[in-house]
Amino acid sequence: FLLRRDQAAELFIVRHGDAIPEEDEIIPSGIYDDLPLSRIGREQAQALAERLSDARFDAMYSSPLLRCQQTAAPLAERLHMTPTLVPGIQEIRLGQIRPLPQGHEDVAALTQALKERQVDIVRIAGTNGHWDAIENSEPSKEFRRRVVTAMDEIASKHIGQRVIVFCHGGVINAYAAEVLGLEKDFFFPAANTSITVVRVAGKQRVLYVMNDIAHVRKHI
């Protein structure tokens, strides 16, 4: 059955914008799990803000990671809101996928390696349906439990309200899988700044919109 808006929390769940830098943007550091938005990602965040500028949200939440906070920023400024940071909706902690160049000189090679790493992550998770195939990662079931707990806790505070949550592709997959009753923890590639809408009332959850990217078609 469908949950009425006045009886449920309506979660607009948004994946962060693109965070794979081009050669002229990258700053070699040796640590690449909390990258800022790329030039494309910043454009996507602005497009999202333009699309949702007339919407009303009762609260705004974000993963603490930089790419999510930067995706939220343009909309937060338009709506005069401040995101609440929620550690439970951070992306899964992954082990090493592939070695990255250690030197700081060849930024072209580093940029290419980061792009290939992202492709590998989606390929491995998509093929297996979970994250345990990547050694030394956060266990897939524990990750899903963490995400569901955090999302449901957000929902419990906002029955009859609409909130927006900025998070990650793995997080969206885990929560959508729980809503749909799927065993897989990863089953689709969530697009950058895509919108997924779920209504939640306790343990009752209904998926209304999934992976909506109408505002960023120029980047497809």
Map each language-model feature to its residues.
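Loop-to-helix element that buttresses phosphate recognition and phosphoryl-transfer chemistry
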Residues: 18-75, 136-148
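Short basic (Lys/Arg) and small-residue
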Residues: 168
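Short glycine/proline- and acidic residue-enriched helix-loop micro-motifs
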Residues: 112-142
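Short active-site segment of divalent metal-dependent hydrolases/proteases
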Residues: 19, 171-172
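Phosphate-coordination/substrate-recognition cap region in phosphate-metabolizing enzymes
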Residues: 4-6, 47-120
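Acidic, low-complexity terminal tails and accessory targeting/binding regions
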Residues: 1-10, 84-85, 92-112, 156-162, ...
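Active-site signature of alpha/beta-hydrolase-fold catalytic machinery across serine-
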Residues: 74, 174-178
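Surface-exposed helix-capping loop/turn segments at secondary-structure junctions
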Residues: 54-59, 153-163
